[in-house]
Design a protein with these regions (language model features):
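Alpha-helical transmembrane segments and their immediate juxtamembrane cytosolic regions
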Residues: 1-374
Length: 374
């Protein structure tokens, strides 16, 4: 099995699901949305990309952290490197909002500059994971891994349990709305908005991904990797069942019960689905056809940030390739295929350029040494 192919495949899956959700939502007319069942299936698939991206950020964060630990790098240095990377992603999220505002001017409201989007929360989640891994990373070996695993689970549970009151009875109303929006996604509205990406509950997916990957670093998981992934898949099924069981219970922990948006039971269900997908994708990459020849899904996963950034403007923005809200299901599907092929071409161009640049630097090492000596 090629190293970490399952991660790129999952990212690529998130990209494909994101494309179809955005394309149908942006281009289909209201009449087409009412008359076609396609939009319902599209929206169902659209519930997965954001959790997948954030969960995989936790998985990748664990990989980077453990690799640095194994090299003997001090935990302060690891924390500095990973937290700065999180800050960089957060900065890119702010830059993305500036770009969207500029391209949408004069129709975009200035408040869109302060909207909490998925890149913002990805960056902040990475910062928080950096702090957590620093706190649990003293020493080396299994002890540090177990501490980080337990802390990741605890952090995910804490975020999930704190979400309902922070959305309802204990909202931090004393904060300015741009700050409160990072807590519960209230933005400029009277109530938190489920289409935004506040820390509560979205950062829980990152902590869940972190914990899942540190479980796979255990000695048993390294010896029996397939069995370990199957165990995660089984845990996912159990989590889904437990979520349904808790939802059907008469016991209510919170004054306001909203299963589909802020309740921990729903987050448990979504984490369970992510673990099931993780196992299925791993199995597909290891024993299936995922790596037989060229894989468009893996290719998109290699450049997920790039295609996320670029496709938005050609679907929702000023340069939309089809008229927004005016297309039939068939026409929107044709547009979706066009976006998919265009983003795949962009992804290939990006990776080809990177490979060419690496080869050029290897052939001319003096080019990389020159700046250091100048």
């Amino acid at each position: 099995m090629k190293r970490l192919a399952y991660i790129d495949w999952m990212r690529g899956l998130a990209c494909v699901l994101m494309f179809q959700t955005h394309c149908y939502d942006s281009w289909m007319s209201p009449e087409a949305k009412k008359s076609s069942s396609l939009i319902g299936w599209s929206r169902l698939g659209g519930t997965l990309p954001a959790p997948l991206f954030i969960f995989l950020a936790g998985v990748s964060f664990a990989l980077v952290t453990e690799k640095l630990r194994e090299k003997g790098i001090a935990r302060n240095a690891i924390a500095k490197q990973t937290i700065l990377r999180g800050a960089e992603i957060f900065g890119m999220g702010l830059l993305f909002r500036v770009q969207e505002f500029a391209l949408g001017y004069p129709w975009s409201p200035w408040t869109d500059l302060l909207r909490v989007d998925v890149l913002n929360i990805l960056g902040l989640s990475m910062v928080l994971m950096g702090v957590l891994c620093w706190a649990t990373g003293e020493g080396v070996g299994a002890a540090a891994r177990i501490r980080t695993l337990v802390a990741g689970i605890f952090a995910a549970v804490l975020v999930a349990m704190a979400t309902p009151p922070l959305w309802t009875t204990y909202r931090p109303r004393f904060l300015p709305w741009p700050i409160e929006s990072y807590i519960n996604g209230v933005h400029i509205f009277k109530e938190p908005q489920p289409w935004l990406f506040p820390l509560f509950p979205w950062s829980a997916f990152a902590f869940a991904g972190l914990a899942a990957r540190f479980f796979l670093f255990s000695d048993l998981a390294r010896r029996r990797e397939g069995l370990a992934f199957a165990a995660l898949g089984g845990a996912g099924i159990a989590a889904c069942y437990l979520s349904v069981l808790l939802d059907s219970s008469r016991v209510r922990l919170y004054a306001v019960y909203d299963y589909w948006h802020s309740n921990p039971d729903f987050l448990l269900m979504r984490c369970g689905i992510l673990l099931i997908i993780l196992f299925l994708v791993y199995a597909w990459c290891r024993w299936g056809l995922a790596q037989k020849g060229f894989s468009p899904v893996i290719q998109l996963g290699n450049t997920s940030l790039l295609v996320y950034w670029v496709h938005i403007e050609f679907v929702y923005g000023r340069f939309s390739i089809l008229p927004k809200g005016q297309c039939s299901a068939l026409k929107a599907t044709a547009g979706l295929i066009t976006i998919f092929l265009a983003m795949l071409g962009l992804s290939l161009a990006r990776t080809t350029w990177k490979k060419w640049r690496v080869r050029a630097l290897q052939k001319n090492p003096a080019a990389t040494a020159a700046p250091a000596g100048s």
